[in-house]
Amino acid sequence: MLVCIPEILSKHEVTEFRRLMDQADWEDGRSTAGAQSAMVKRNEQLPPDSELARMLGRRIVSALTANPKFVSAAVPLQIFPPLFNRYAASGNHHFGIHVDNAVRGDPLTGLRIRTDLSVTLFLAEPDEYDGGELVVEDTYGSHEVKLPAGDCVLYPSSSLHMVTPVTRGARVASFFWLQSMIRDAHARSMIYDLDGAIQALVERLGRDDPETVKLTGIYHNLIRYWADV
């Protein structure tokens, strides 16, 4: 399941993020890559332990957890501290086909998570750069994603994916992973679809409608059955 969510950050917030990031020192992005990923990764990254990266990451997590669509799609248990990368045409930056590590650990906090979902939050407008599409492969084929600044995309961390070479400008983004309460991707997809149907019924019939109440009960009982907390 690939889900795009608009306006996690406002345009004003994106501008503020970019102003701060443009003043920062960047390092080789391979510093946080696994052995296989490091062979195909060419980009720059804010130092994960920098005060700026941590501060901006906290703001992103706060915005995400306040977004109903994100919570519905991810059912998050633990969110890894967001990281920040930059793909510049001047560096021939790209990230070849790879799969994310199954487990990620944060040396600063000791947090360890199973990576169920990967998230990219775009911090550059599509017209600021050429190339730089996120390409995610699944059983239905390849999906290219290039969203407006402030929007994010969620996709299963088990997916093969890549970032195509940037040929003009710079692609700036935040990327991170999360562990969901719902381990199974198919179950998580059904929960998301069911929640969407319930919200549509609430708009049409009201929250107190008997059928809405019944379906809401089914939703929570499925969460109870599947959730790891």
Swiss-Prot record:
Ranges of residues in domain Fe2OG dioxygenase: 78-180
Co-factor binding comment: Binds 1 Fe(2+) ion per subunit.
Co-factor(s): Fe(2+); L-ascorbate
Entry GO MF terms: 2-oxoglutarate-dependent dioxygenase activity; iron ion binding; L-ascorbic acid binding
Gene Ontology terms describing biological process: DNA damage response; intracellular iron ion homeostasis
Signal sequence segment: none
InterPro entries per record: Oxoglu/Fe-dep_dioxygenase_dom, PKHD_C, PKHD_hydroxylase, Pro_4_hyd_alph, Pro_4_hyd_alph_FE2OG_OXY
Keyword terms: Dioxygenase, Iron, Metal-binding, Oxidoreductase, Vitamin C
Protein biosynthesis is among the record's keywords: no
EC number annotated for this UniProt entry: 1.14.11.-
Residues involved in 2-oxoglutarate binding: 171
Keyword Oxidoreductase listed: yes
Binding site for Fe cation: 98, 100, 161
Name by which UniProt lists this protein: PKHD-type hydroxylase RPD_3334
Native source species: Rhodopseudomonas palustris (strain BisB5)
